């Protein structure tokens, strides 16, 4: 079984069911995003000190599914341009949940799932 994944351990999780310790930096950044604001995966990675790890941020947030946590995952979107970020969850149910959570916080999501970074983007104080 060398090289094979253990099917009883969810992808991205350790055998003990905890996320990899390197992901805690991403979770700390996401926890700082205020209600009604959004950040991009790349922005979270950069603020966590890992500027080329946007995809890892996505894996880390995806690993939260089905767990009890207080991380506001819905506030992290995929960058589409300098002006917009967008919901990037491919699952229609997941993207609908993310949209509803964002709209409940006052974030305007257009028909294409985009959010204005100028209006709703988070600019943290360093």
Protein language model annotation of sequence segments:
Residues 2-126:
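Nucleic acid-binding interface residues in structured DNA/RNA-binding domains
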